[in-house]
Regions:
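Nucleotide-sugar donor-binding/catalytic module of glycosyltransferases
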Residues: 2-230, 349
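C-terminal subregions of glycosyltransferases and related glycan-biosynthesis enzymes
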Residues: 157, 188, 213-350
Length: 350
């Protein structure tokens, strides 16, 4: 799609690109450069170094006055982004992970669809290897032309909807002002809370083309197959997501979601099974068991309020096998599913 630059620029939203970095010295320079190279005049780049012990600080300082840099002790991503947001002034906020890259023209495309009442604009992200070469699938898997109303409906039903990871989201300052700063009751990852709460404060607009390069290098937080305990961590994040949504509902007057909604989500079902099979002592979902997950597999498939698809059937089969197979076979199935990211739910599908 082609845009008239003068028409887009007349809208004049300003951008704040906030980069929280911790020990990604080999990547953070690329992230900063991709932000500075955006063909949008009204932008600021804010870099928060969260106590790095590698060469990150020297890399950041090389950009001089082109970036607004802060160097703090290590407190985690949530606190780094709290600081970054407090120092920002843009109408639109992007929390760019320090190992990711904004594709040229990203700000212009985001600005072209920006309008009042939007809580976030989300874009597709292209996976790359550690050197930035495209590999694997584009995320999220989502039907072209999906509407904000469809996303909102799914979020209200399942506390979940198709969303890219952090760098693929451009947030309304008006929305973030209502929820920031995020305190310790929220998840340590900023994405968890912002993504969960956004549908309750405004429209979510999707640009169905990749505008971010998502670097995969083995240390990514989203690489669940890196460690067995990661699945239990993700299940625990479901609590934080539920808490965030409850806060949003109290603030906006929406009905409070019930705890049982956590057992009606097909993606969380897979994480629950992986958590209970691999690290059962760290599984932290009260009332959960493999027996319950077995029954939930059928309930989700048979009684889901969204149209069933081929992937839903495959998820049912995978879930049953991952529950009943001997430990070593179940572990292989879990690793195969999450390391290759097969059975990623096709949501909001035709």
């Amino acid at each position: 799609m082609q845009y008239r630059l003068e028409e887009v620029m007349s809208k004049s939203p300003s951008f704040s690109i906030i980069i929280a970095n911790y020990n990604y010295g080999q990547y953070v320079g690329d992230a900063i450069e991709s932000a500075l190279m955006q063909d949008w005049v009204s932008k600021e780049v804010i870099v928060i170094d969260d106590g790095s012990t590698d060469g990150s600080i020297n890399t950041i300082k090389k950009f001089g006055n082109n970036v607004l840099g802060f160097f703090t002790k290590n407190q985690g991503q949530r606190e780094a982004n709290n600081l970054g947001f407090s120092m920002s002034s843009g109408d639109i906020i992007i929390f760019l992970d320090s190992d990711d890259i904004l594709i040229k023209g990203a700000l212009r495309e985001i600005a072209s669809v920006w309008h009042a009442g939007v809580s976030k604009i989300q874009v597709l992200v292209q996976r790359t290897d550690a050197k930035g070469r495209p590999v694997g699938a584009i995320m999220p898997r989502i039907r072209s032309g999906v509407t904000p109303q469809e996303i909102q409906k799914q979020a209200w039903l399942y506390l979940d909807y198709p969303s890219p990871p952090g760098s693929g989201n451009a947030w309304s300052r008006e929305f973030l002002t209502k929820i920031f700063p995020l305190d310790s009751k929220f998840d340590s990852s900023t994405d968890t809370s912002c993504i969960a709460m956004a549908p309750y404060y405004g429209d979510i607009v999707t640009i169905d083309r990749p505008l971010v390069l998502y670097r995969t290098h083995g240390k990514n937080d989203s690489n669940l197959s890196n460690g067995k305990e990661n699945y239990s961590r993700e299940v625990a994040r479901a609590f934080h997501r539920l808490y965030a949504v409850q806060c949003a509902c109290l603030d906006t007057g929406h009905p409070l979601p019930k705890y049982k909604v956590l057992f009606e989500n097909s993606h969380l079902l897979q994480l629950r099974i992986a958590s209970m099979r691999l690290t059962p002592r760290k599984h932290s979902l009260p009332g959960d068991s493999l027996k319950k997950a077995f029954y939930d597999s059928f309930k989700i498939f048979l009684f889901s309020k969204k149209r069933r698809s081929f992937f839903d059937g495959m998820i049912l089969i995978w879930s049953i096998l991952a529950i009943i197979l001997p430990g070593f076979l179940a572990e292989r199935m879990i690793d195969f599913r999450f390391s290759r990211r097969i059975l990623e739910c096709t949501v909001l599908n035709d």
